[in-house]
């Protein structure tokens, strides 16, 4: 039997956050994840809180947590609290900074808007260096939108038309520039088969790189905002964006594209690299299928690939995600947590799972369904609390990450809070801890 201090189930942003925080504190950690996480589909920014459940728009996300607690006492942020939520987000920022993916937030702690691939504006709190933090006051003279020949996962006309609907941008010129990069012939079988990964590989060639720089400098000026799809990576994306800025002297705004999202992949790669370099053990491509319980404790877990070798730990953190990641499964009449059969908060009347209108002014009820936890994020099983198991991230009940714009923030805050409680249990046996 393999034994660890902390076993983390799930390799999304919550799972990696929990595993890294425990590892930094000197614990022996194993991380078990089934495959690619939802970070491959993400914007690469961290949303803390964009809207309250009643629909009110949030400007200062941490200041709004008191109002959130009044509206939804069972919200994950309400259980974690403002202080620990802020500590968790700042810890994550420092961790990513040290992994060479610096994230920025506004000096006054407010949300900023990021321009999406659709030309809409979305509230967020932490963004990568080449995501323009729009606050409603344009400090650019024109918007230049880069369209790459043969790349179908970005629609510049849609972005331009939607962005032009903003009243404050009505008089700002918006131009689309078509860029042709030599060398695509070896990557595609038809004219519209390119993916962001293909372009990222191609731009490592000097001729392709120079062609991109030359075409941009011919049409754009330093006082423009140049919006381009995130095509720089994979593994060296920020370095290449910095190089592009230095060569062209232009100001860039990267927008995520259809999967794979290189902005999201940057974060996952940074988290993975930090975990492995820190000495963590990762079982990638494996899946926890069940566990052994004794009273109020989880004593061991079994994985699909290591059925004859159970894994035991003093503490377990579960971050298997929601429906997309199969951390929750919905049947015709019920929603279940499939790994340990944990108790799930839900409405037994399926007719009450949704509103009559798909596009509704409020969150659909099923989006708030998830694993039931106590104030310390311990789940229960058949009504009995599991004392050495913590749940975090999208599998939790009590919130709608999409409607409220808080998915990344809740994932990080709950993971950090869970591990801080684990570390508190070691307080009597003081061990060296590395703090970032």
Swiss-Prot record:
Gene3D superfamilies per record: FAD/NAD(P)-binding domain
One of the GO BP terms on file: glycerol catabolic process
Biological pathway: Polyol metabolism; glycerol degradation via glycerol kinase pathway; glycerone phosphate from sn-glycerol 3-phosphate (anaerobic route): step 1/1
InterPro entries from the UniProt entry: FAD-dep_OxRdtase_2_FAD-bd, FAD/NAD-bd_sf, G3P_DH_GlpB_su, Metab_Enz_Cyan_OpOx_G3PDH
Pfam families from the UniProt entry: FAD_binding_2
One of the record's GO molecular function terms: glycerol-3-phosphate dehydrogenase (quinone) activity
Principal EC category: oxidoreductase
Keywords: Flavoprotein, FMN, Oxidoreductase
One of the record's GO cellular component terms: glycerol-3-phosphate dehydrogenase (FAD) complex
Domain of life: Bacteria
Cofactor needs: FMN
Catalysed reactions listed for this entry: a quinone + sn-glycerol 3-phosphate = dihydroxyacetone phosphate + a quinol
Record EC number: 1.1.5.3
PANTHER family xref list: ANAEROBIC GLYCEROL-3-PHOSPHATE DEHYDROGENASE SUBUNIT B
Family designation: Belongs to the anaerobic G-3-P dehydrogenase subunit B family.
Quaternary structure (record): Composed of a catalytic GlpA/B dimer and of membrane bound GlpC.
Purpose of the protein: Conversion of glycerol 3-phosphate to dihydroxyacetone. Uses fumarate or nitrate as electron acceptor.
Protein name: Anaerobic glycerol-3-phosphate dehydrogenase subunit B
Organism: Vibrio cholerae serotype O1 (strain M66-2)
Taxonomic lineage of the native organism: Bacteria, Pseudomonadati, Pseudomonadota, Gammaproteobacteria, Vibrionales
